Amino acid sequence: MKRAIFTFYNLSIDEEIVRLQSEVLKKLNKTADFLPLCSQTHGEEVIHPQGVEYGFNELFNKGYDTVMLLDVDCIPLNQYALEYTFDQAEKGKLIGNAQIGAHLQNPEHMYAAPSTFCLSRQMFEEFDKMTFMPDHRNADTCGFYTLEAEKRGKEVEFYMPTHFQRRPRNHVWDLGQGRGEYGIGTTYSNHLGVNMFYHLFETRLNIYNSLFYDKCDELLK
């Protein structure tokens, strides 16, 4: 299987975040091509969903069998996290970090979020190469894939938040239905209880970035 990991960011993102994510992946990634996608723009000139849409289509068109998307402030916590995620996607699952969109029509619908989101080309083609773009009513970025997988009876595996480091400025984000909360510096685990991915959130604010630096330093020792 030909595997790829990509992340999308622009020139407004803290360069140290970009560098450290790359270093962590260089250490832990053994089987996939890591292909960072940098838009030579600032702010909202090219928005994140557009980069995600471009990245998946481009990589599948180039012949990759399985593609993992990571937010630039999201990192695997061990080699197993990457291998397990790819393996499950290649078995026909949609897999990623759990999230909800409080502004959506169904605010408690859980979907595989673009912070960690892994998809096989087989599923991409089976779903008629559907869009990764949000409509902000029924789905956020990548959200239509979870909706379509559920509709077709495909298995969706979620990495659930187990703990986080800081409360967000307004309030903690709650998955609802007793499924847990997430916030700044969230660790996500699989159903076996293994810590898989760490996602900082709100990197663009440049408030919490030192937490990401510290987590990466921990992993790079």
Predicted regions and their residues:
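Short beta-strand-to-loop acidic/aromatic patch adjacent to the donor-nucleotide binding site
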Residues: 64-75
